[in-house]
Amino acid sequence: GHVDAYGMNPASYITELHCDFFIVGGEFSKEEDINIDFVDIHFSHVEKWFKPPYDLVINRDSSEHLMCFQPDEAQANITWKEKQCKLNVFCSRTVPLGVGDRETKFNYAYRFHLSSKEKYHFSWFLEVASVLRECFMYLIGTGIYTLEIKMAENFNEESDSESHSEPKQYMIYFGVDVPSYIRTDSSLYCTRYDKLKDLFSGFIERWFENRSKLDVVVSSYKEILLNDGTYEDSLFLRIVQTLEHFHGIVFDKANKYCSKTEWKAFVDWFQKNT
């Protein structure tokens, strides 16, 4: 990147930094030196995909009540480009110091932890985070945005304690395009964790296994969900192209195409009902 500094008064110069990303917390002579073994990711929308972690138990015979913290938990093993890491779903929380006049909030956030036994270049972890984000776009059925990424090296708890170095944590910031419209209504989510918890680990693993085969479909699907200001006809055309490509992958050559009679009947039906 580069730096622009300008202004009439030297005491109040305006400085603009131009780069692909910022990494705060470390000193690196070159990008190739940034090797890590842990990433903490916070995505939008996922809080409502998992269950609320707090349960309030009200004692009718007393003024005392019980607040229980029981979040969803999940794990999966990920293999990406012949390297491996482990995914853990972690729910962070804050406890209020006192009771407010009108309400007391118990804030929480579901986060995704990626950890590996070996150190890998941070770009590999960012690729895994990107594929994981696409996976949750598919599960939830709306655009998902990365809210925060933290990285660390020497984090692996399975390392030998005698040779284990002090963990170092870094924050990474990317340029973000904020869309004009974001759908947040959780009632429109395609799936929920409580319906998929027995299949979650296997689903994540298979998603990464088949990601390269579905590259065009997944990229197009993500583009549809993240569109901002696209005309309706252009969006519909993109959906048709995506379904057509996906159809070509799933079905064999014998069943890939329908007859002209079936196609004409479908077009007639579509024109009458749209």
What is each stretch, according to the model?
Residues 30, 48-51, 81-86, 105, ...:
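Context-gated lysine
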Residues 161-163, 170, 175-274:
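Amphipathic, oligomerization/interface secondary-structure segments
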Residues 37-54, 145-169, 263-270:
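Short, charged N-terminal helix-start/capping segments
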Residues 1-143:
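Long, contiguous, compositionally biased segments that the model treats as domain-scale units
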Residues 103-198:
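Internal metal/ion-chelating core segments
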Residues 9, 30, 42, 59, ...:
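Serine/threonine-rich low-complexity intrinsically disordered regions
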